[in-house]
Structure formats: structure tokens, C-alpha cells
Amino acid sequence: MTDEQKSFDTLEERLNARKTEYETMPVPDAAYQAVQSGIRQAARKRKSRLRWYMSSISAAALILLFTGCIRVSPAFASFVEQLPGMEGIVSMIRQDKGLMMAIDQSLLQKVGVTDEHDGTSLTVDGIITDESRMVIFYTMKGMKDPEKFNYDIDLLDENGKDLPVAFTHAYPTPSPDENVNENMIDVIFTDGTSPPEELSVVFKSRDTTSAEKWKITFPVDKNLTKGMKKVIPVNQTLTVDGQRIDVKQATLYPTRLVLDVNFDPKNTKKVFGLSDLQLVDEQGRAWRTDTSTGEDERSIYFESMYFSIPKKLTLQGSGFSGLDKEDLALSLDLKSHQITGGPPGLKMVGSKVEGKDLIIDFSVAGSMDGGFVLSFGNVTDSAGKSYEVPGSSWSSGDGTDDSHTIVSSTVENGAKLKGEVKMNISTYPMKVKSPFSLDIPVNP
């Protein structure tokens, strides 16, 4: 056995050890909230409102998608050696075939810049980026309560302005060293935005008694993926349970495939997301997605096959999550808990004030697992004033009834709300089973 092979085998053993560690670790409720926190930050900073659809299992999936054996290539081994101690993050991206192929093509930009003070540090280890996506790998050391991720993240361009992007971050990855946490920030570029010439990653403590901040600035090497973009026209129409979906085009980048679709405004249902969506090639390999952006005009993001373009590609799904458009708007009496309009079976079970916010509890039939949670776009009071509803949390069971889920929606600055309010549903856990498939012309 050569020294090189021994090195690969040793690395593989380390990665599989981390895989076992992930499979046995519990997933805290904070995992989902951490992802939602990143989405909310992005939504507030966008010039135009961006809605990011993500299934309720996505946060856990960011941590727990480890199936089968972990095999490593020389480029993959080199990547780990470039970023010591990053086996946890590497195990996570190992399930993203597109990112792994990008690494195999030496598209990783090493950064290695650290901001350290008062015994704590933040290091940006490296990035992978193209015109559509940027993945930022970082390491936290000595942070207070990193498992709670009590920090806000800002991404700034070379002029110090917020990037108009959406991004997510997962629950901090466990490490053999409890003082070290490894993670990544997954950034989407939309609406003509692109990677900046220079990027600043800023972490700010949410602790009101502290003004701690860590800032790392570095140039972005856009030449690594310059010109790497392939557009595949599709221009076909799907009809799923009577709902018309126009599939416009697929755009291939090194880090992802972007499928652009239009949902017919004349559809009777609001489609929140397509269920079990995947692209399948002639070898039966599945290229999956759990993220999309937009409303009627929507971009759906898949793993990239840029460096392994198939001969045949089929879009497959089992149906969709959606709701009749006439059930999206409702009126709610905060005193009597009476709901007028909305989907059948939705009930208000209580409310409470927390600081400046109002928390409204709803009972929803069924489970949030594997689907969309109840969420709202906004709340309007009797005077026409609008309030944001940035997030929801949930727990199983309505008293002794395990067939329902309690969803708690936070109305920002709504502590003084009284009487009747109007609410608009953004997502709801209503699934429609209607399998579909569509051939994508890879070489039109």
C-alpha cells in the first residue's frame, strides 16, 4: 500500500467516524431556528421581498444527511488537508454531488483569515462560489454558548453595503474539541446579483450586554468559475392535479442547477412547493433539491451536474404542497379566538405577549414533518397597520390529541394588538398526491 493510499484510508476512517457521530447525535429545536434566523435576516435586507421555501426537515437534513459509505478522491483528500479539522463540514457537503465535483475541479478558494480578540476567534477557511451560489466555510473558537448560535451574520460587499442575498446557516457542527465549532454559510445570488469583488463576513453577538463583533474581509477570486454557465431551454408545461406549471429553462453552474418555472396565475391553488422533487439521469442517479425562491415565477435549486452532464434527465415528483387560493386569507378575533375564512380545521388555541411581540398559538391537523409549516406573510390590524410574522415554531399534540400540531407564530411588535386582525397564509402543511414526470432535453 502506498503512502498516498494510506493517507486516503486514514482520512476515510476519520470521515466515517464523524458520520457515526452525526447519526447518533440529537437534533435540537434550535437547529431549525438557526436556519430560519438566517432566512429572516436576508428577507429584511432585500430591496424586494424574497420568500425562501424550505421544508421543515431541511435544518436537520443539513446535519444528518449521511447515508452509505463515504468515499474520497485525491482532490477531496487535498481539500481536507487544506482545511485542518474540517471533517465535520466535509461530511456535510459530501452529500452534495455538485459541490464535491467542484472541489474535484479545484474550485475551492482558500482564505484562512482570522479575527481574534478576548480569547475568541472566527476564521473563514475557504469558499466555493460561482454566479449563482457561494458556500463559506468557517470555524468558531471560544465563542460563548455556540450551540445556541446567539449571533447575527452580515455579509458585506467591498463598499461595506449589505449583499442583497438570501443565506442559511446550519446548527454548529460538533467537534472533538468542545471549544471549536465548524459550520458553513450557504448563499443564494438572485435578481441579477453576483459575488462581490471583496467580501466581509461579520458575526455580531445578540447579547444586549455585549458589543462583541468579529469581521473578516478578503478578496473573492471570481476567475475560478468565470464563464462556467450553461443554459438548457425546456419550454414545456406540466399539469399536476389541475395546476399548470410552465418549465422554462435549466441553468447549470458548478455549484448548482437552477430550474426556472412559472405557476399559472389562473391556478385555483397556491402551490408552496413540489413534493419529492428530483432530477434523475439515465443511470438512475437522483439530483435532489429542498430549496426554491420566488412566488409564481420560481427558481428551484438542485445539485449540480456541471462536470458530469447526463445523456438523459427526467424531472420527477409525487405531487405538491398547496392550498386553495380562497383559503389563504383569514380574519382572527384575538379575544374570542374565532377564525373566519382560512383552511378547514385551523384553530386558534391561545396567545401571549413576550416583550414587544405577540405569540399566537394555532392548532393544525396533521404533522409538520416532511412538509411545510403554517406560516404567515403579515398581520393587519383594524387601522390598516401591518406587522411582520418572521417565524414560527411548533410542537406535536393538541392536549392529548397527537393528530394535531401546535404552531406558534410570532407577530413582531404586536404586543398591543387587540380585537380582530387579518392574516395571509404563506405556507401550510396541506399535501396533494399527484405523481408527475417531465423529460428535460439535455442536448436540445
Where do the protein language model's features map onto the residues?
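Intrinsically disordered, low-complexity cytosolic tails and juxtamembrane linkers
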Residues: 36-48
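Internal signal-anchor transmembrane helix that establishes type II topology
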Residues: 45-75
